[in-house]
């Protein structure tokens, strides 16, 4: 496993190299795509990217948790959580990469 992290700048640079837009236009394109995805998730919509996966927001209800050190019951507030479900193709690509 690598310690490398793919950043916005890396994505912008890839768009610049592969699509041929200027660096500024590439950065704007990446930022616009991420904003569209974020806005859709905030509205509770799914973001499905073919051959990659699906991002969605789930509502978790309130529940009672337990402090592992003391054993004391602690209320956990209801919240929204972001989930990602990779496509079968993405799962296969990751698994194939692990076999190298």
Curated annotation (Swiss-Prot):
UniProt-listed Pfam families: Bac_DNA_binding
InterPro entries the UniProt entry points to: Hist_DNA-bd, Histone-like_DNA-bd_CS, IHF-like_DNA-bd_dom_sf, IHF_alpha
UniProt cross-references to SUPFAM superfamilies, sorted A to Z: IHF-like DNA-binding proteins
Any single biological process term in GO: DNA recombination
UniProt entry keywords in alphabetical sequence: DNA recombination, DNA-binding, Transcription, Transcription regulation, Translation regulation
CDD domains per UniProt: IHF_A
GO CC annotation terms, alphabetical: cytosol
PANTHER family for the chain: DNA-BINDING PROTEIN HU, INTEGRATION HOST FACTOR SUBUNIT ALPHA
HAMAP family membership: IHF_alpha
Quaternary assembly: Heterodimer of an alpha and a beta chain.
Similarity-based family: Belongs to the bacterial histone-like protein family.
Protein name: Integration host factor subunit alpha
Organism (species): Ruegeria pomeroyi (strain ATCC 700808 / DSM 15171 / DSS-3)
Taxonomic lineage of the native organism: Bacteria, Pseudomonadati, Pseudomonadota, Alphaproteobacteria, Rhodobacterales
């Amino acid at each position: 496993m690598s310690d490398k992290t793919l950043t916005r700048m890396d994505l912008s640079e890839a768009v610049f190299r592969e699509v041929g837009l200027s660096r500024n236009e590439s950065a704007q394109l990446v930022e616009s795509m991420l904003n569209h995805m974020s806005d859709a998730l905030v509205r509770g919509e799914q973001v499905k990217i073919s051959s990659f996966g699906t991002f969605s927001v789930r509502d978790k209800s309130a529940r009672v948790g337990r402090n592992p050190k003391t054993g004391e019951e602690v209320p956990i507030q209801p919240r929204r959580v972001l989930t990602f479900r990779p496509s079968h193709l993405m799962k296969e690509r990751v698994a194939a990469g692990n076999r190298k």
